[in-house]
């Protein structure tokens, strides 16, 4: 039946949270830690690798001229990117848009004061068992990153670098959540535990 069917005459829908809700909460959390938090976009779409390069460029601009935020800063974005499998990748590896985003961002970073995490808020990134990953300029070698991107095997690469973020299924989905952290005091490599975090039971009352 369509929305005009009598069965839905007294039905109503309420949106409890969306991507902007998550970004706003993340911004408030960053501000409590002393960061200048800026939401740069709520609806990033398109190629994950392109978005990764663009976010890395924002980070470099933040370091060099203090725009669009002055360090220590956190640049946040939401939306959902995609990965287009190339013809050369007949048997793609394990990965997803969030893993591809951070690997591509890591390749483009020059400053060691930038850390880039990206997660899917439902806890599952593409074909992997992780929510996403986290990198800085030193997490991955250029050669390994380029090989993984060519095979779309980015989650495997991040796992080898102890740079996957695993939460388990979260019971919700408000798109992706990306944070570009610009702070001389942060380091990404080896900072994320490989142990899953217990996700809340969506049926719990």
Predicted features and spans:
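Internal helix-turn-beta structural module
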Residues: 91-204
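Flexible, glycine/charged-enriched surface loops at secondary-structure junctions
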Residues: 1, 34-43, 64-74, 112-119
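Accessory alpha-helical/coil subdomains and C-terminal extensions
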Residues: 1-39, 44-52
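Conserved mixed alpha/beta catalytic, RNA-binding, or beta-rich assembly cores of soluble enzyme
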Residues: 54-61, 71-109, 113
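Active-site proximal loops enriched in glycine and acidic residues that flank catalytic Cys/His/Asp
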Residues: 39-44, 77-79, 85-87, 118-120, ...
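Structural signal for hydrophobic packing residues in well-ordered secondary-structure cores
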Residues: 26-37, 55, 59-67, 109-110, ...
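Flexible loop/turn segments at secondary-structure boundaries
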Residues: 47-48, 83-85, 123-127
């Amino acid at each position: 039946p369509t929305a005009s069917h009598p069965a839905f005459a007294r039905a109503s829908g309420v949106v409890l949270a969306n991507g902007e809700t998550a970004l706003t909460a993340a911004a408030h959390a960053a501000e409590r830690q002393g960061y200048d938090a800026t939401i740069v976009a709520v609806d990033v779409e398109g190629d994950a690798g392109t978005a990764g390069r663009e976010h890395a460029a924002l980070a470099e601009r933040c370091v060099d001229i203090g725009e669009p935020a002055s360090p220590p800063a956190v640049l946040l974005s939401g939306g959902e990117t995609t990965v287009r499998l190339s013809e050369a990748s007949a048997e793609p590896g394990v990965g997803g848009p969030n893993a591809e985003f951070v690997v591509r961002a890591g390749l483009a970073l020059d400053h060691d004061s930038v850390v880039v995490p990206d997660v899917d808020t439902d806890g599952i990134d593409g074909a992997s068992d992780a929510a996403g990953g986290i990198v800085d300029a030193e997490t991955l070698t250029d050669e390994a990153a380029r090989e993984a991107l060519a095979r779309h095997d980015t989650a495997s690469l991040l796992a080898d670098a102890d740079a996957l973020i695993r939460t388990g299924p979260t019971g919700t989905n408000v798109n992706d959540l990306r944070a570009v952290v610009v702070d001389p005091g942060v380091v990404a490599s080896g900072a994320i535990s490989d142990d899953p975090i217990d996700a809340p039971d969506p049926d719990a009352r």
